[in-house]
């Protein structure tokens, strides 16, 4: 049976910004200040264009602040052959930045849900991970945000999210433990209430 596309309002709007965004020139000057603070000379040849490059890179790295998750999740499909079992998208690569030190977080996300009459396009799940990843984050918060946005928009029987990531704030500084990763999970609905469904999710993620 052909899918029927419907639009629904969803969760995950762009975060509120307390103040007006600084100008490009102000952002570039802030980079020059940091370079001087680090002991560098922003006027030397190799650093002349660095402020502009950093500002451009940050606009890309933090593009999630410009995007609204509900715009991604607002379109769902009905009448997909009566399918009502687990939908899992695993090994979604992502990067984010630690909100405490503004250094990278690199990992993979695994996202599953149990449909209740509607399903999402598979690319939409990966897109949600990307949007939340391209913001300053803690891994715990990002895990919960992904689950909550799908839960509130799709209204499935349950959502399961697992993130496995390495934090450069632990690898490059502080305790300097390269290769250590952090695992977080978030469950809603049936996944939260039924341990057997949690085990099934974990098994599906790990089976290759």
Curated annotation (Swiss-Prot):
Q: What is its EC number?
A: 3.5.4.16
- What InterPro entries is this protein classified in? GTP-CH-I_C/QueF (IPR043133), GTP-CH-I_N (IPR043134), GTP_CycHdrlase_I (IPR001474), GTP_CycHdrlase_I_CS (IPR018234), GTP_CycHdrlase_I_dom (IPR020602)
An example of a Pfam family matching this protein is GTP_cyclohydroI
Give the top-level enzyme category: hydrolase
Could you list this entry's UniProt keywords, alphabetically sorted. Answer: GTP-binding, Hydrolase, Metal-binding, Nucleotide-binding, One-carbon metabolism, Zinc
- Report the record's Gene Ontology biological process terms: one-carbon metabolic process; tetrahydrobiopterin biosynthetic process; tetrahydrofolate biosynthetic process
List, alphabetically, the PROSITE patterns matched.
GTP_CYCLOHYDROL_1_1
Give the catalysed reaction(s), semicolon-separated. GTP + H2O = 7,8-dihydroneopterin 3'-triphosphate + formate + H(+)
User: Which Gene3D superfamilies does the record cross-reference, listed alphabetically?
Assistant: 1.10.286.10, 3.30.1130.10
GO MF annotation, one: GTP binding
**Which residues are listed for Zn(2+) binding in this entry?**
98, 101, 169
Q: In which pathway does it act?
A: Cofactor biosynthesis; 7,8-dihydroneopterin triphosphate biosynthesis; 7,8-dihydroneopterin triphosphate from GTP: step 1/1
Which GO CC annotations does the UniProt entry carry?
cytoplasm
Q: Which SUPFAM superfamilies does the UniProt record give?
A: Tetrahydrobiopterin biosynthesis enzymes-like (SSF55620)
Can you state the subunit structure given in the record?
Toroid-shaped homodecamer, composed of two pentamers of five dimers.
Q: Which family does it belong to?
A: Belongs to the GTP cyclohydrolase I family.
Q: Which NCBIfam families match?
A: folE, PRK09347.1-2, PRK09347.1-3
Q: What is this protein called?
A: GTP cyclohydrolase 1
Its source organism is Agrobacterium fabrum (strain C58 / ATCC 33970) (Agrobacterium tumefaciens (strain C58))
């Amino acid at each position: 049976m052909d899918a029927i596309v419907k639009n629904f309002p969803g969760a995950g709007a762009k975060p509120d910004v307390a103040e007006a965004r600084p100008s490009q020139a102000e952002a570039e000057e802030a980079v020059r200040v940091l370079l001087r603070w680090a002991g560098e000379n922003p006027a030397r040849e190799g650093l002349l264009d660095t402020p502009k490059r950093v500002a451009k890179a940050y606009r890309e790295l933090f593009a999630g602040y410009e995007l609204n998750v509900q715009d991604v999740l607002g379109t769902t499909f009905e009448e997909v052959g009566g399918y009502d079992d687990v939908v899992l998208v695993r090994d979604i690569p992502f990067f984010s930045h630690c909100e405490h030190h503004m250094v990278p977080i690199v990992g993979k996300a695994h996202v599953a849900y149990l449909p209740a009459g509607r399903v999402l396009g598979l690319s939409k799940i990966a897109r949600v991970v990307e949007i939340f990843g391209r913001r300053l984050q803690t891994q715990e918060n990002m895990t919960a945000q992904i689950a909550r946005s799908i839960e509130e928009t799709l209204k499935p029987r349950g959502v399961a999210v697992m993130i496995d990531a390495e934090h450069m704030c632990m690898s490059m500084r502080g305790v300097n433990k390269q290769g250590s990763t952090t695992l977080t999970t978030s469950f809603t609905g049936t996944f939260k209430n039924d341990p057997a469904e949690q085990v099934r999710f974990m098994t599906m993620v790990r089976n290759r």
